[in-house]
Design a protein with these regions (language model features):
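Amphipathic alpha-helical interface surfaces
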Residues: 40-47, 70, 86, 98
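Detector for Asparagine
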Residues: 29-30, 42, 71, 96, ...
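Catalytic cores and adjacent binding grooves of peptidoglycan-active enzymes
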Residues: 79, 83-125
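Glycine-rich, flexible loop/turn motifs
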Residues: 4, 70, 79
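Extracytoplasmic cell-surface/polysaccharide-interacting catalytic and binding patches
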Residues: 1-54, 118
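Extended, low-complexity, intrinsically disordered C-terminal regulatory tails
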Residues: 45-75
């Protein structure tokens, strides 16, 4: 993927979806299959970028795409949308406000799950 192709939107890059600290630590290949790229683009263009603009605060992708092996090792659901490029776990300073903004924005989404103790929000399209 060329450098220009890595930027998905003004606020999100493809490499944010691929990076995994656990994959690096364990030496796992979390390479992105070409068939999930359209789903990642859809998630970013239709949900994440509009939400980021509405929220007006940084949102950081903690977990994006996961290979089947990585998903298993992190304890993800066997049918996790992360493996399809349809979900992200994000961090933002004010998670409650982000959820309020998500509802107020009227954006279409599948799931929004607040993990209070882990400090992130799972979003899927």
């Amino acid at each position: 993927m060329e450098k220009d192709e890595k930027r998905l939107t003004e606020h999100f890059r493809m490499d944010e979806f691929i990076y995994s600290a656990m994959a690096v630590e364990l030496g796992l290949n979390n390479a992105l299959p070409s068939e999930v790229i359209p789903a990642i683009r859809n998630l970013t263009v239709r949900l994440l970028e509009p939400l980021r603009i509405y929220h007006r605060q940084p949102m950081y992708i903690m977990s994006g795409y996961r290979s089947e092996e990585l998903n298993r090792l992190v304890g993800g659901a066997p049918s996790s949308q992360h493996m399809k490029g349809e979900a992200v776990d994000i961090y933002t300073v004010d998670r409650n406000r982000l959820l309020e903004d998500l509802v107020a924005s009227c954006l279409n989404f599948d799931q929004a799950i607040l993990y209070r103790t882990k400090g992130f929000i799972h979003l899927s399209s």
